[in-house]
Amino acid sequence: MIFDIHSHVLQKVDDGAKNLEEAIFIVKDLISQGVKKVLLTPHNIPQKYTSSTEELKSQFELLKEEINKQNLDISIYLGQEIYYTKLTLKKLEEKELLSLNNTNYVLIEFSYYNEPNIEEILYEFKLKNYKIILAHIERYRYLQDIQKIIHLKLSFRTFNSSKFFYNMR
C-alpha cells in the first residue's frame, strides 16, 4: 500500500489543484499509481499562501464528499506544509496551523539558503511534543551531509527522483 504524505491536491488553497475537478483528476492519477492513502498538505507561507484552518477544512470536506460520491478507492487526510517562522509553534498550539492528520507530526519547510538553528527549533518542538518531518530535504544545501541529518535525528520527505534519494542507496 502506498501512502503519499505530501501532496498539493486540495483545491483553491495554494499552487496545487485550482478547482474540485482538477483535484479529482489528481486523485484519480494517484489511484492509478497505487496510492491508497494521501495526506493533503497545502502550503502555509506567510504573505503567499495563508488559508485559514477553517477554509482548509471546508475544502477538505468538499473533496472528501466528491471522492465518496464517485466511489473512489482512496482515503484522504488533512495537514499542512508549513514554512517555518518564529510564530509557527505558537500558531500550532493555537490551532491556526494544522499538524498532519491531528497528530503530533508537523511537515515543516525551512529557508533553503539561510540555515536556521535546527537543533534549537527541534528542541522547542520536542518540548511541546511535536515531531518535525522536513519537506524537500533535497533542496537544503546545508543539509547535504548525511551525518548532520543523523545527528539531528531528522525525519524527512523527499521525491524518489531527488539527488539525495539516489545518494542514499
Question: Each PLM stretch: what is its role?
Answer:
Residues 50-161:
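Extended substrate/RNA-proximal surfaces in nucleic-acid metabolism proteins
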Residues 5-11, 38-43, 107-109, 132-135, ...:
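Short beta-strands and strand-loop turn motifs
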Residues 1-73, 151-152:
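An N-terminally biased module of ancient metal coordination in phosphate/nucleic-acid-related enzymes
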